[in-house]
Amino acid sequence: MSWRPPVHDAPGIERNWYEACFRAHAGSCGCGNFIAHINLLAGRYGFTGGPPPPGGPPPGTPQVRASRNSPAAPQQPPALPWHGDGGEGGAAGPPGAGGDAAADAHLGDEELADLLDAIEDDAQCSNRRSKTRARRTDGPPTPIDTLEEYKWRTRNKWDPAGCSTPLTGEGAILARELSNACTRNLSTMKAILHNQKDLESFLQQRQQRESSESPKKAHIQRKKGRKPLQKSRRRRRQYSSSSDDSESSGSSSSSSNSSPEKCSKRKRVST
């Protein structure tokens, strides 16, 4: 592909070239001044370049300056003397030797004895505390059964030799847990009472329904018990009527049978 003339004019070409150089330098270095960087590299590798253009640089071009040297690191302040070095002669011996020697020189026999007694008392107190802690942490913590016992333990005076046992928390946490447990118990009791009231009302309504329906059922049962009696009576009546009919038919037949005999007798008598 053949080269073609650029589209931009001279100022546009220069701007694009400057921007390309700036971006290429920014891609590999972060100093922010690629002109000074190029001048430094040119002086290091002995590349002086061609002669300057005639007439000097165009007006408005920035003057190329050499990069400034980095400021020197601040000097470290002198180290302060260690506490107890013994003043001016602290460097002569180990730390703490001069001060302890001066303090021992100023203390008397009685003061030294008091100091030793205080050290022994502190050691004994620390041993007692460690023993009490070991004794308390060996066994499980004592449970709290009632609210009064919990209040008495929380309001009791603080024991300097005491310590917290395992599986126990602070007073605020225990109080919060206790209040949560109380609220849960209260809610369950309310639910139980509500269910009990509902059950009682249901039983009362059921009894009322049964009491209201019982006379109706008794009346219906009475009616059901009377029906077979009425049927038997009707049957008896039917039977009685049929017997009456048979008796009447029998009497009529007997009368009819007796009438010709009478007639025959009468005829015989007449002859």
Swiss-Prot record:
This is Probable protein VP2. Keywords: Phosphoprotein. Residues 207-216 have a biased composition (Basic and acidic residues). Residues 239-259 have a biased composition (Low complexity). The keyword Nucleus does not apply. Phosphorylated at C-terminal serines. Residues 49-103, 124-146, 203-271 are annotated as: Disordered. It holds the Pfam family DUF755. Residues 217-238 have a biased composition (Basic residues). Residues 87-99 have a biased composition (Gly residues). The lineage of its organism: Viruses, Viruses incertae sedis, Anelloviridae, Torque teno virus. The keyword Phosphoprotein applies. InterPro entries: DUF755, HEV_TT_vir_Orf2/Gyrovir_Vp2_N. Residues 50-61 have a biased composition (Pro residues).
